[in-house]
Amino acid sequence: MDPIAFSIGGFQIRWYGIMIALGVLAALILANLNCRYKGYNFDSLIDVFLISFPLAIIGARVYYVVFQFQDYRNNLMDIFNIRLGGLAIHGGIIFGLGAAYIVSRYKKMDFIKLWDCFAPSIILGQAIGRWGNFFNGEAHGGIVGYEFISKFPLFIQRGMYINGDYYNPTFLYESLWDLIVCIILVYIFRKKHKRGTVICTYVGLYSLGRFFIEGLRTDSLMIGHIRVAQLVSFIGIVLSISFFVYLKGRGKRVD
């Protein structure tokens, strides 16, 4: 699979960047629809997004480089080249949420209400962005036989044929899981729910899916023998369950 979509004056435009851009566009469209449905101010959400998204990208890169520094030790300038991949979603989520919290506090906005609205958009963007990994030939699982890969569409088979072997398309599993979670989150958001339910569901369900899918991957970031994404996902599941217990007793219901 050619990772380069086209070139302009010798400058290569890669599918990885295109898929991230499409994910952002889809996320903003869905956020606008959700704001209209609830009567929220979309402009306020955009104000937060314009600050938190760039910091999320930086966080995703920093997170990846920290755990994969051996790849950059001899050429530190490569740290700034994200066109070939190397963005960790967990880092983006942590930095993005942190930035959004600070901005929302500064602007005296309701952080929980804000992210209840935007959580479906985040997971939709992730679902689309995962296809950038497909074009880069990364975020896949181990070697599989033709009998297994033949069950997938032909373009998936071709994309997962790398250096003479077929690989398990784990990026596809996560993308589909993210779409399912997105549908669930939109449904919850548009019904009456307790404040914080949507973002809590996002953290819990995404972490649950990522925990199991990560176990199939061959390029996981590691701490010793522990997969970092599985560790963070486990923490996310625990936090989500804890917050649901809190919501059951004290959360406020919103329209």
Swiss-Prot record:
Q: Where are the transmembrane segments?
A: 15-35, 46-66, 84-104, 169-189, 196-216, 228-248
**Residues binding a 1,2-diacyl-sn-glycero-3-phospho-(1'-sn-glycerol):** R130
* Name of a matching Pfam family: LGT
The EC number(s) attached to this protein equal 2.5.1.145
Instruction: Give the GO cellular component terms, alphabetically.
Output: plasma membrane
Pathway(s) the chain acts in: Protein modification; lipoprotein biosynthesis (diacylglyceryl transfer)
**Cellular location(s):** Cell membrane
Q: Which keywords does UniProt give here? A: Cell membrane, Membrane, Transferase, Transmembrane, Transmembrane helix
Q: Does the keyword Ubl conjugation apply?
A: no
Recorded topology in the membrane: Multi-pass membrane protein
Q: Which GO terms describe its biological process?
A: lipoprotein biosynthetic process
InterPro entries cross-referenced by the UniProt entry:
Lgt
Q: Which GO terms describe its molecular function?
A: phosphatidylglycerol-prolipoprotein diacylglyceryl transferase activity
In the record, the note on similarity to other proteins reads:
Belongs to the Lgt family.
Its job: Catalyzes the transfer of the diacylglyceryl group from phosphatidylglycerol to the sulfhydryl group of the N-terminal cysteine of a prolipoprotein, the first step in the formation of mature lipoproteins.
Name of the molecule in the record? Phosphatidylglycerol--prolipoprotein diacylglyceryl transferase
The organism named in the record is: Clostridium kluyveri (strain ATCC 8527 / DSM 555 / NBRC 12016 / NCIMB 10680 / K1)
Q: What is the lineage of its organism?
A: Bacteria, Bacillati, Bacillota, Clostridia, Eubacteriales
